[in-house]
Swiss-Prot record:
One GO molecular-function entry: fructose-bisphosphate aldolase activity
Subcellular location, principal: cytoplasm
Organism of derivation: Cicer arietinum
Name this protein carries in UniProt: Fructose-bisphosphate aldolase, cytoplasmic isozyme
Keywords, alphabetical: Cytoplasm, Glycolysis, Lyase, Schiff base
Length: 359
């Protein structure tokens, strides 16, 4: 039982439930300056503040798109940016009924004495940052822990002490300052493991994480989970969406408490269409699913939009149309009603996998 007490108790529960509204999901637009630079470089656009702001404005002002979103995760720079006309992005989102969120971790660092295993940085000063972000309009936060599957990893000590407990400390600090914490656990798709290995590791990781959250008295009703879907490794043959769905839902059923209002999947390098089709299959699985099963996609919502835009003002409408197509498709997938799209935008079927992905 959580002993969490805070003036934000009811607000946290309400905001977490709102983000988990069926038919809606999260746009992850919180790429660091370095990561968004790589995205811009792929379309031959310079990584400067004006271009980063232009891309975010394109995303946040796309006609009819925000109706399919309940939240947008921002990078710190973006939280304080405005449209070209001077309207703060936070106001643009709030007026459309979309909650602004904020990335609060400081990236990963390799742990000495391990075979490339990592822990996430950013706990120092987190409380003060969260208070500042809440004041600026953010209502939820994201912290990404990264694990990989290999012959000997993730090790139990790294899993439970470093990453699970780091996530738990982050979560309770966020809640003390009014932010709903997204607990993000990404098991990288890198490797040749089969889907059964991924399922076993995913279950182990989730079980350790919820043990840590309980130990730290985190209010589960005021949290969200952002896990990977259960898939084979990138060097293994793909399996049908129904197989991904079966293994993913079973892993959640075995480990995620019903008190959690929503599970918002990361795309993990899947193509836009693959991520949507798999999400749709997950929502078509019969059986006990006490949480909303939705999306928190970055690359898998933006790839065809980036390709269509290419940094040119005259392409903004086409780029926003591409974003609308993907947002609507993923909204349908959260309801299990997506029928597929015969007219995919450029890049929608392109694998977005990057080995040892840094966000």
């Amino acid at each position: 039982m959580s002993n969490f007490k805070s003036k934000y108790h009811d607000e946290l529960i309400a905001n977490a439930a709102y983000i988990g509204t069926p038919g809606k999901g999260i746009l992850a637009a919180d790429e660091s300056t370095g990561t968004i630079g790589k995205r811009l470089a792929s379309i031959n656009v310079e990584n400067v503040e004006t271009n980063r702001r232009a891309l975010r404005e394109l995303l946040f002002t796309a006609p009819n798109v925000l109706q399919y979103l309940s939240g947008v995760i921002l990078f710190e720079e973006t939280l304080y940016q405005s449209t070209a006309a001077g309207k703060p992005f936070v106001d643009v989102l709030n007026e459309a009924g979309v909650l602004p969120g904020i990335k609060v971790d400081k990236g990963t660092v390799e742990l000495a004495g391990t075979d490339g295993e990592t822990t996430t940085q950013g706990l120092d000063g987190l409380g003060a940052r969260c208070a500042k972000y809440y004041e600026a309009g953010a209502r939820f936060a994201k912290w990404r822990a990264v694990l990989k599957i290999g012959p000997n990893e993730p090790s139990l000590s790294i899993l439970s002490i470093e990453n699970a407990y780091g996530l738990a400390r982050y979560a309770v600090i966020c809640q003390e300052n009014g932010l709903v914490p997204i607990v993000e656990l990404e098991i990288l798709v890198d490797g040749s493991h089969d889907i059964h290995k991924c399922a076993a590791i995913t279950e182990r990781v989730l079980a350790a994480t919820y043990k840590a959250l309980s130990d730290h008295h985190v209010l589960l009703e005021g949290t969200l989970l952002k896990p990977n879907m259960v898939t084979p490794g990138s060097d293994s043959p793909k399996v049908a969406p129904e197989v991904v769905a079966e293994h993913t839902v079973r892993a959640l059923q075995r480990t995620v408490p019903a008190a959690v209002p929503a599970v918002v999947f990361l795309s993990g390098g899947q193509s836009e269409e693959e991520a949507t089709v798999n999400l749709n299959a997950i929502n078509q699985v019969k059986g006990k699913k006490p949480w909303t099963l939705s999306f928190s996609f970055g690359r898998a919502l933006q790839q065809s939009t980036l390709k269509a835009w290419s940094g040119k003002e005259e392409n903004v409408k086409n780029a926003q149309d591409a974003l609308l197509t993907r947002a609507k498709a993923n909204s349908e997938a959260t309801l299990g009603t997506y029928k597929g799209n015969s007219q995919l935008g450029e890049g929608a079927s392109e694998s977005l996998h990057v080995k040892d992905y840094k966000y």
